[in-house]
Amino acid sequence: MAYEKAEWRPVTGLGKQVASGEIKSIDQVLESGRPIKEPEIVDMFLPDLEDEVLDIAMMQRMTDSGRRVQFRAVVIVGNRNGYIGFGQGKDVQVGDAIKKAITKAKMNLVKVRRGCGSWECGCAVLHSIPMQVEGTAGSVRVTLKPAPQGIGLVTGDISKKVLELAGIKDAWTFARGQTRTTINFAKATFNALKETNMIRTGRSE
């Protein structure tokens, strides 16, 4: 989903280092451990980033002036090659809620460590994940397990979209809890992918 972009004038130290060329890759940004507070940092290094709206919900609450309606958008961004972000945004306009969610997803970007952790396969292709990982959100717990090439993504539609944008092609997925809650199912899958960075193996990226 494309939106018109204004000229970027970085205001954070990290943003200024990126704009000046001192930081030369998104990996350097992520490895610095510093929070990404400007989405343009991600745009600079990942111009091919895709976004997908997973859910839009109408939310109502009572205020002193009466009933107020807002929309909540849940969005993921990814380049189908090892990077994924998750975000949600709220606004009285659907389009603005989506824009806010995309911005937050970019600022929550993580690198996914891919590999072939399946004993049934053992190839050196980065088609799956290097080991079993788990992620939780609310009542939902998602377990991702490496799968051999050709199995595909054995999971529900929401989790599948997250894995696809992250660049995972084969994986077994097991989920518990209220998986019909889109936001928690998506976030639990995202959190599981974040865990791939906790362990490094010789056949992963």
UniProtKB/Swiss-Prot annotation:
GO terms for molecular function: rRNA binding; structural constituent of ribosome. It holds the Pfam family Ribosomal_S5_C. Residues 49-112 form the S5 DRBM domain. Keywords: Ribonucleoprotein, Ribosomal protein, RNA-binding, rRNA-binding. GO terms for biological process: translation. The keyword Metal-binding does not apply. InterPro entries: Ribosomal_Su5_D2-typ_SF, Ribosomal_uS5, Ribosomal_uS5_arc, Ribosomal_uS5_C, Ribosomal_uS5_euk/arc, Ribosomal_uS5_N, Ribosomal_uS5_N_CS, Ribsml_uS5_D2-typ_fold_subgr. The keyword RNA-binding applies. GO terms for cellular component: small ribosomal subunit. Belongs to the universal ribosomal protein uS5 family. Part of the 30S ribosomal subunit. Contacts protein S4. The N-terminal domain interacts with the head of the 30S subunit; the C-terminal domain interacts with the body and contacts protein S4. The interaction surface between S4 and S5 is involved in control of translational fidelity. With S4 and S12 plays an important role in translational accuracy. This is Small ribosomal subunit protein uS5. It comes from Methanoregula boonei (strain DSM 21154 / JCM 14090 / 6A8).
